[in-house]
């Protein structure tokens, strides 16, 4: 059976991604000084304006406007003709402390308050909710092919802009890849869409030729492209006005780009700007860690795990898996293995993945999962041999 599946990515200059990167840059700056800080940092951008807001409890000081400007500069918005300038944009901040009602449940989990003997790492979940982790063996990064290819294109767009190969490119951009599957295996790419911001002096014909040569052919395997592959490069015909001048941006608006490109389910919680007591982030990372190690151990060709929490409670309220008919053992047996090999209490996740570190800014563009260019703890295949003992 043949079917098509499509996923998109965006470059670091996309307005929503600017916000994610500022929020995580603030988190990293705080964690560099105070690893036990509580951070929920949200950012909004529009023409000439950055607003950073949220709840932060810490014993250190960081210069948030400076962090925002440096982040914007590193992305590439460093001159007025781009429609957004790190030097001249206004930066407003409005920060409160974390609610004491929330803090009391995170500081001491329900189990601890009830007198259960638990280890010191068992802090309560910072919120209720369900998180999903996914992995598939269809690519070397254990990610679905459509989102993996879309990220390769968006990273390459930024690379050729920053290294001067295509100096007329500007920071904003989006990519999209449609993959054709046969019998659940990716066999070819049916369509590629690239929209990239550019200077007014360049022709559409040059953009199309350059992106085909320096972006698409540079990162997409030739065997996946054929005479029937369709290419849509700047299909509107012009993309000069972009970034925050073209669209307002908000933290947490690219959660599907951040995860599995829609191929796996999503619990709805965003990642950027949140310290790891927020299970929206830490439990989603842990769920990916679980799923990837299970697939690497040969338990299934693809696997999704859902974990759910109650606010102020350490132990998950539920864990369930779906192997989409590819499992070598039953789903119930897989859940039993998860409970034996992994500790999914928030404090244990923070401990085992060493999450109280300034490692988050680098994840805020081009996806949080399948990052072969980064050393991320939730991508480590360090539980495979232990899992195999139970097979």
From Swiss-Prot:
ATP binds at residues 14, 172-174, 238-239, 247, 253-254, 270, 274. GO terms for molecular function: ATP binding; magnesium ion binding; methionine adenosyltransferase activity. Keywords: ATP-binding, Cytoplasm, Magnesium, Metal-binding, Nucleotide-binding, One-carbon metabolism, Potassium, Transferase. Gene3D superfamilies: 3.30.300.10. Binds 2 divalent ions per subunit. Binds 1 potassium ion per subunit. This is S-adenosylmethionine synthase. K(+) binds at residue 42. L-methionine binds at residues 55, 98, 247, 278. Its cofactor is Mg(2+); K(+). Mg(2+) binds at residue 16. SUPFAM superfamilies: S-adenosylmethionine synthetase. Pathway: Amino-acid biosynthesis; S-adenosyl-L-methionine biosynthesis; S-adenosyl-L-methionine from L-methionine: step 1/1. NCBIfam families: metK. One of its GO terms (cellular component) is cytoplasm. Belongs to the AdoMet synthase family. GO terms for biological process: one-carbon metabolic process; S-adenosylmethionine biosynthetic process. Homotetramer; dimer of dimers. It holds the Pfam family S-AdoMet_synt_N. It is found in: Cytoplasm. It comes from Clostridium perfringens (strain SM101 / Type A). It catalyses: L-methionine + ATP + H2O = S-adenosyl-L-methionine + phosphate + diphosphate. Its main location: cytoplasm. Its EC number is 2.5.1.6. It comes from the Bacteria. Residues 98-108 are annotated as: Flexible loop. Catalyzes the formation of S-adenosylmethionine (AdoMet) from methionine and ATP. The overall synthetic reaction is composed of two sequential steps, AdoMet formation and the subsequent tripolyphosphate hydrolysis which occurs prior to release of AdoMet from the enzyme.
């Amino acid at each position: 059976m043949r079917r098509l599946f499509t996923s998109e990515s965006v470059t670091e200059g996309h307005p929503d991604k600017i916000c994610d990167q500022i929020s995580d840059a603030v988190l990293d700056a705080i964690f560099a000084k105070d690893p036990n800080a509580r951070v929920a940092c949200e950012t909004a951008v529009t023409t000439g304006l950055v607003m950073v807001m949220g709840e932060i409890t810490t014993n250190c000081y960081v210069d948030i406007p400076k962090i925002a400007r440096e982040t914007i500069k590193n992305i590439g918005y460093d001159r007025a003709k781009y429609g957004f300038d790190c030097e001249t944009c206004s930066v407003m901040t409005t920060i409160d402390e974390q609610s004491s009602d929330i803090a009391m449940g995170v500081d001491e989990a329900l189990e601890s308050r009830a007198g259960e003997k638990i280890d010191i790492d068992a802090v309560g979940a910072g919120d209720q909710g369900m998180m999903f982790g996914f992995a598939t063996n269809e690519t070397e990064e254990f990610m679905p092919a459509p989102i993996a290819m879309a990220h390769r294109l968006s990273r390459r767009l930024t690379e050729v802009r920053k290294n001067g190969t295509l100096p007329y490119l500007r920071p904003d951009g989006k990519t999209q890849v449609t993959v054709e599957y046969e019998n659940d295996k990716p066999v070819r790419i049916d369509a590629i869409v690239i929209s990239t911001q550019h200077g007014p002096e360049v022709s559409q014909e040059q953009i199309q030729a350059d992106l085909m040569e320096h972006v698409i052919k540079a990162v997409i395997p030739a065997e996946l492209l054929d005479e029937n592959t369709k290419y849509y490069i700047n299909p509107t015909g012009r993309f000069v006005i972009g970034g925050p001048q073209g669209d307002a941006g908000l933290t947490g608006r690219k959660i599907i780009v951040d995860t599995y490109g829609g191929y796996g389910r999503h619990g709805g919680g965003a990642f950027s700007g949140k310290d790891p007591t927020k299970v929206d982030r830490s439990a989603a990372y842990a769920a990916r860690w679980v799923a990837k190690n299970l697939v690497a151990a040969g338990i299934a060709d693809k696997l999704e795990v859902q974990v759910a929490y109650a606010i102020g409670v350490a132990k998950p309220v539920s864990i369930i898996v779906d192997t989409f008919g590819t499992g070598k053992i039953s789903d119930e047996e897989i859940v039993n293995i998860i409970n034996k090999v992994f500790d999914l209490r928030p404090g244990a996740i923070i401990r085992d993945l060493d999450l109280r570190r300034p490692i988050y800014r680098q994840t805020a563009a081009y996806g949080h999962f399948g990052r072969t260019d980064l050393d991320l703890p939730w991508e480590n295949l360090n539980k495979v041999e232990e899992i195999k003992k139970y097979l």
